[in-house]
Amino acid sequence: MACFHLLSFGAMCRAGLLGNRCVAEGNRWEIRCQHLQFSKHGYNASSQLMFGIRPRLPISEEDRQWTDNGFDQLSRLLGHQRMLHAKVVLPDAEHFPDRYDRSIAAAEKMFCRVCEYMDLDRRRVDFEVFPDATDELRDLVPYWQSSQGGCAGLYVHPEGEKDRMVVALRQSQMEDPLAVVATLAHELGHVILLGGGLLERGAKDMEPLTDLLTVFLGFGVFNANCAARFRQWQNNQCQGWSMQRLGYLPEEIYGYALARFAQERSEQRPPWASYLSTNVRSYFKGSLEWLQAENKRAKGAIT
């Protein structure tokens, strides 16, 4: 019988044994990494245009403009080249070769790798794990302030300590390695934007922009797949289902953001898209077809 502590992160992903719980806003849900394959024909917006059919964008025009403006803002803050050269991080043994046994030590190894992929100096950021009980957290981290007692992770920059930042992970979050990476990528995004003085904490849309940053820096597969989770359960007496969220952006916007990411990098058939969950990949595919069609239409108008 396979034991989780004997499997690497990548092996767990391939075997479909990726944890049982993920915590966001105090909720838990089952999670499973879904490896989906491209159709043999790929994404073909040209065939639709040939018959006068224009692909339909799966998000609203308002959401599209927000996402595009977010990419433009991040390009101004970090440089467009940073996105173009970002390493796309995937849930496999190549990117996370260490054994994951849900311990603090294993989570810290994962934290170090996420820091490396996000081009952050790990020595500037302390890693902590906080208990689920809010009262215990206040004793452990007295400078913590939050109205969200069920948050999955925390970023703290203590007053008067310019060079010290803390990223903390909720203890029950460690059950799920995919959600660990997604949460760490988001909180380390705060290190880049807030700790780096690029944004103020009270900036408009600071949290969703930080989620968008995870796509910009190559962690979109993790954060998009963790955005919404469907869970079914049953016992001898009853059965039911639930849907829970992690993060601030919905799957639809993640799908478009990933398509914009791929287009900016001239990736027409990115292999990493096979790691997207069913819903996200559908939104990604529709968005990429729309972007390709708009690009062809714009070129036709110019000529």
What are these regions (language model features)?
Residues 181-196:
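Active-site recognition of the HExxH zinc-binding catalytic motif
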